[in-house]
Amino acid sequence: MSAIWIAIAVLSALSLVFGGLLGYASRRFAVEEDPIVEQIDAILPQSQCGQCGYPGCRPYADAVGNNGEMINKCAPGGEQTMLKLAALLNVEPQPLGAEEAREPERKVAWIDEANCIGCTKCIQACPVDAIVGATRAMHTVLSDICTGCDLCVAPCPTDCIEMRPVATTTANWKWDLHTIPVRVITVESHA
């Protein structure tokens, strides 16, 4: 019985020593993050789509903050994101490329459930977990969560996933208030 208590005491002492060493090492060798990279990453849409040429939003933010990468490469963020980045970094806004010049039409993935074999490759490819389903059962896309990054289309072995535009409703309609004519009527006061 005393051998068990000795083993428990030795393991407890070792865990305290190693825990202390790890705690010291984490403080001593801590890598300080660049605050500008954190701010850039907060502005980006976090769709992790890779359309900018980087594997996600964090590497792109690191490239913009530390390597002087152009701020107009985020296609999902569009002009709004580019203008916010320009204001943050105190640089001139850069014109978007020809393909990003117009506001991109929002598309979401759509799965033809009749042809879905339930292989789960699309679920594994989705960076935001917008696809639900089970193995060997049909899958479906949660359109409110889907960012339209198009990463789920290529892995599908049956080609049952396609990108479809989001239907325009009153909830997602973008009103162009600058084209609505406004006429100011002056009211005369009679005193």
From Swiss-Prot:
Q: Which residues are in the 4Fe-4S domain?
A: 32-91
Q: Which GO terms describe its cellular component?
A: plasma membrane
User: Carries keyword rRNA processing?
Assistant: no
**Highest taxon, organism lineage:** Bacteria
The protein's Enzyme Commission number: 7.-.-.-
Q: MF terms per GO, please? A: 4 iron, 4 sulfur cluster binding; electron transfer activity; metal ion binding
What the entry lists under Pfam families is as follows: Fer4_21, FeS
Protein name as it appears in the record:
Ion-translocating oxidoreductase complex subunit B
Source species of the chain: Erwinia tasmaniensis (strain DSM 17950 / CFBP 7177 / CIP 109463 / NCPPB 4357 / Et1/99)
Gene of this entry = rnfB
